A protein has these predicted regions:
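Hydrophobic transmembrane alpha-helices and immediately adjacent juxtamembrane helices
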Residues: 1-237
Length: 237
């Protein structure tokens, strides 16, 4: 199944390669630069999908009456849910993303003094996706059909970050920069690594705000999760 996972996710890379079979740049970015952005976001998302995504099964446990079992144990309910039914088959997506990122770093002429940002952006992206999944899980205490809606923010966010944000409308980019900080998964820090200016004209210091944006989203997600737990009513109550 790991091999199947690699083949499935490789289709995303194939789409990028097909695009560049017909053009030399995409919104001013070369093929290898796009692969770099894709790989960086892909590693973050794939690790989060592997380790955290089970949090979106909250509504299933509530409907089945099994969520109470997570509350009576002396371990964080969030931690229990994320480790519930660990699926190693998702390792294929992680491996594929690592390979793409490694290739892009190897072929791009990157300045050595900027490479420190790569692990920072991968960790930051992981935290942002984890916070998004936590918000989706928290919403399920009120909306039992939230998983489908939540996919628009988690898997949809992953799709959004596969390409340079320069391909999207300015208003959308503002939204994913100042409201839902998806731009800090790979776009803003990626511009620093690539030595590129932001086509939208954001100042240079924005390249380094990823950890702060991730922390703010984590605090919001933590608050939402605690509120969800506080307002949860057992099926037996």
């Amino acid at each position: 199944m790991t091999v199947l996972g690699i083949i499935t996710t490789t289709l995303d890379v194939a789409v990028i390669l097909i695009v560049f079979a017909n053009t030399t740049t995409l919104a001013g970015f070369s093929r290898d630069e796009v692969l770099f952005l894709y790989g960086a976001a892909g590693v973050s998302f794939a690790l989060c999908d592997l380790l955290v995504s089970n949090i979106d099964r909250v509504s299933q446990h509530i409907k089945a009456g099994t969520f109470d079992t997570f509350l009576i144990r002396p371990v964080s309910s969030w931690l229990q849910l994320t480790t519930d039914r660990f699926n190693p088959n998702r390792l294929g997506r992680v491996l594929q993303a690592v390979l793409v990122l490694g290739y892009a770093v190897a072929v791009l002429d990157l300045e050595g003094r900027r490479l420190w940002m790569i692990p920072v952006m991968v960790v930051t992206g992981f935290v942002i996706f984890a916070a998004l999944w936590t918000l989706v899980g928290a919403a399920q205490f009120l909306l039992t059909d939230a998983p489908e809606l939540g996919n628009a923010f988690t898997y949809g966010g992953q799709q959004l970050t596969q390409y340079p944000l320069a391909v999207y409308a300015r208003d959308l980019v503002k939204g994913v920069t100042y409201v839902l900080p998806m731009a800090f998964v790979n776009w803003q820090p990626g511009l620093y690594v690539l030595g590129r200016d932001d086509p939208f004209g954001t100042p240079e210091f924005m390249r380094f705000l990823g950890p702060a944006a991730a922390l703010a989203l984590v605090l919001a997600a933590g608050l939402a999760w605690r509120q969800g737990i506080r307002h949860y009513r057992s099926t037996g109550s």
